[in-house]
């Protein structure tokens, strides 16, 4: 069993795209045993606790993840015992079937080379993702030569993440209903030049890699759009987040909260509102936001009209406004996307609205940390999804 989770804090500077190398991003833990023979590695736990702002929360979440893995192991063993399954044989069958379906789906795509370029807001310059797909028989090779070089910012995407979100884009287009396992991805390869934003050289920072990595499915869809009819959708947006740390009522806090944007429309339906693609994160509940940090939610509502026009409109983004009431200042940082380059419409559909972040009515650069004082108000508007097809008269 395995689990991936966001922790409230891992040390270093608080999470933002503004950090310039991995050493600012907190703990780097090589493969070590947290438990051995059922016993917690107290030395490792002490090291983690000493280097994070909220050790009870961070270690509590880690142990919660461990408990989840243990429960999955128990239930899997029960299933295998009760049903008399051979796990290895079952895995081979499932992976083999998934591989066959994916290879057949790729074979149905005409052999050839397909290209699409997507652009991100960037910092001093726009970030370019140049996606070239070569289809030959039952294989698909995706190359990102021509993409932006790695940056001294926390948006670099490590190769495993590049592959994961590229392969995901292929899967949702060609074989969305097949079980998600290694077999689905054996016919797919990805390459990116070393030193590029999709294959950075250590110690490049990558804590905000999602805002670039989550654009890769759109790059894949854009490249294959000419041969896939109306199976692709208009662009949406990765989610945004804000992280806050400080001290209130005698205790230290560190929290991370997520906000979704609008989903792009398709040839069959309007985009869902406040549902980022391809994110698998929900919006943080208001009750959690207010209970973990000294903030008061002034409003949280659908950002009406932010989706792009079209035969089918893009989904609307989110409008969130909160007020900070802590007696002591707090440091707040943001990870945000689609503030300059909007989610593109498709087949004549309109672009979605860009997102913005403002403090006391003044738009800010989300890459810069903000110091909040009592009474400060922050408003975050996430982007709307692109529309699909020309609007009907």
Language-model segment annotations:
Residues 1-393:
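Glycine/proline-enriched, intrinsically flexible loops and inter-domain linkers
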């Amino acid at each position: 069993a395995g689990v991936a989770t966001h922790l409230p804090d891992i040390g270093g500077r608080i999470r933002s795209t503004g950090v310039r190398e991995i050493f600012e991003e907190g703990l780097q833990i090589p493969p070590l045993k947290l438990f051995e023979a059922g016993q917690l590695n107290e030395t490792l736990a002490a090291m983690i606790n000493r280097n994070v702002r909220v050790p009870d929360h961070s270690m509590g979440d880690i142990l919660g993840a461990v408990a989840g893995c243990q429960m999955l192991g128990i239930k899997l063993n029960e299933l295998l015992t009760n049903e008399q399954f051979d796990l290895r044989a079952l895995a081979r069958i499932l992976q083999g079937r998934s591989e066959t379906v994916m290879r057949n789906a790729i074979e149905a795509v005409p052999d050839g080379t397909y290209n699409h370029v997507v652009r991100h807001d960037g910092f001093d310059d726009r970030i370019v993702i140049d996606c070239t797909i070569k289809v030959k028989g039952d294989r698909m090779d995706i190359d990102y030569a021509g993409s932006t070089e790695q940056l001294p910012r926390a948006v670099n995407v490590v190769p495993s993440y590049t592959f994961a979100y590229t392969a995901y884009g292929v899967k949702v287009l060609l074989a969305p209903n097949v079980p998600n396992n290694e077999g689905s991805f054996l016919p797919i390869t990805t390459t990116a030049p070393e030193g590029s934003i999709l294959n950075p050289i250590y110690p490049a920072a990558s804590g905000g890699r999602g805002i670039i990595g989550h654009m890769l499915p759109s790059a894949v869809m854009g490249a294959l759009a000419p041969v896939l009819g109306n199976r692709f959708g208009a662009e949406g947006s990765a989610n945004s987040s804000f992280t806050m740390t400080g001290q209130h009522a005698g205790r230290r806090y560190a929290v991370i909260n997520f906000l979704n944007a609008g989903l792009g429309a398709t040839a069959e339906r309007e985009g869902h509102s406040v549902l980022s693609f391809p994110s698998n994160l929900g919006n943080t509940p208001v009750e959690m936001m207010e209970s973990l940090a000294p903030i008061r939610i002034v409003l949280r509502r659908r950002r009406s009209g932010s989706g792009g026009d079209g035969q089918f409109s893009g989904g609307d983004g989110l409008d969130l406004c909160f007020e900070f009431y802590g007696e002591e200042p707090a440091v707040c940082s943001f990870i945000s996307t689609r503030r300059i380059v909007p989610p593109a419409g498709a087949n004549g559909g309109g672009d979605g609205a860009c997102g913005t972040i403002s403090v006391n009515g003044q738009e800010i650069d989300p890459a810069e940390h903000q110091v909040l004082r009592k009474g400060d108000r922050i408003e975050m508007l996430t982007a709307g999804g692109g529309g699909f097809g020309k609007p009907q008269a």
